[in-house]
Amino acid sequence: METATLVAIFISGLLVSFTGYALYTAFGQPSQQLRDPFEEHGD
């Protein structure tokens, strides 16, 4: 394959991996450890 194709595939893979990790952190198992500042500020 050409170098440009490999670089494009690598960058696309990184982007998909980062997006998947961000979604997992936001909605998956670790999300229960996140604090909610709106819940803490009850006025």
UniProtKB/Swiss-Prot annotation:
It is found in: Plastid, Chloroplast thylakoid membrane. It is a single-pass membrane protein. Pfam families: PsbN. InterPro entries: PSII_PsbN. Keywords: Chloroplast, Membrane, Plastid, Thylakoid, Transmembrane, Transmembrane helix. Its main location: plastid. GO terms for cellular component: chloroplast thylakoid membrane. The chain crosses the membrane at residues 7-27. One of its GO terms (biological process) is photosynthesis. Induction: Expressed in leaves; transcribed from the opposite strand from the psbB-psbT-psbH-petB-petD operon, it is found in the antisense region between psbT and psbH. It comes from the Eukaryota. Disruption phenotype: When grown photoautotrophically on soil is highly light-sensitive with extremely slow growth and pigment deficiency; on sucrose-containing medium under low-light grows like wild-type. Strongly impaired photosynthesis; both PSI and PSII levels are decreased. May play a role in photosystem I and II biogenesis. Belongs to the PsbN family. This is Photosystem biogenesis factor 1. The gene is pbf1.
